[in-house]
Curated annotation (Swiss-Prot):
Contains a chromophore consisting of modified amino acid residues. The chromophore is formed by autocatalytic backbone condensation between Xaa-N and Gly-(N+2), oxidation of Tyr-(N+1) to didehydrotyrosine, and formation of a double bond to the alpha-amino nitrogen of residue Xaa-N. Maturation of the chromophore requires nothing other than molecular oxygen. The precise stereochemistry of the tyrosine has not been determined. There is a cross-link at Q62-G64 (2-iminomethyl-5-imidazolinone (Gln-Gly)). Fluorescent proteins have become a useful and ubiquitous tool for making chimeric proteins, where they function as a fluorescent protein tag. Typically they tolerate N- and C-terminal fusion to a broad variety of proteins. They have been expressed in most known cell types and are used as a noninvasive fluorescent marker in living cells and organisms. They enable a wide range of applications where they have functioned as a cell lineage tracer, reporter of gene expression, or as a measure of protein-protein interactions. This is GFP-like non-fluorescent chromoprotein. Belongs to the GFP family. The modification 2,3-didehydrotyrosine is found at Y63.
Amino acid sequence: MSVIAKQMTYKVYMSGTVNGHYFEVQGDGKGKPYEGEQTVKLTVTKGGPLPFAWDILSPQSQYGSIPFTKYPEDIPDYVKQSFPEGYTWERIMNFEDGAVCTVSNDSSIQGNCFIYNVKFSGLNFPPNGPVMQKKTQGWEPNTERLFARDGMLIGNNFMALKLEGGGHYLCEFKSTYKAKKPVKMPGYHYVDRKLDVTNHNIDYTSVEQCEISIARKPVVA
């Protein structure tokens, strides 16, 4: 029997650096894990206002809150199976201008609340680039491909940030999800996601986000 209820809350504790600037973020989220819907309110508690675009942080607290993904019955849900022991994930984000972010997350559960402890490091963002100039305007919807390897779930996708004035800033995400106990492994599949910032104050020290996340098999399989 799953320890995950139809409606769950979660807490985010994120800390890290971007081009040497230290920050901390805390958040409170809620959603429906079996329907793939979630919302979160996030606050910069140290290091604000941030001298870089919020958008590089936004996927770490939602496309990062993986239990809130709707899975069909014929695909084993790797992450939900991992609880109550939980799981970890590690991610590398390679941007087209040479900037790199490394991220780790340790996810646990307390009652009807997930706890996410996130560590973030961003390096080599050009001073005149869209991140340090805060010229990004949110992520396009994306699709992650996922496959099993050595008891872990490997994810890979190509993301695109919308830019002020038009165009896109591209980034490849490589994620490794590791359950803290043996679970039934899924086959090759996809997860479609749409992440939006729905509200924020002028300096992005208080942000609200929502995400829809749905798993599926390949359309032409």
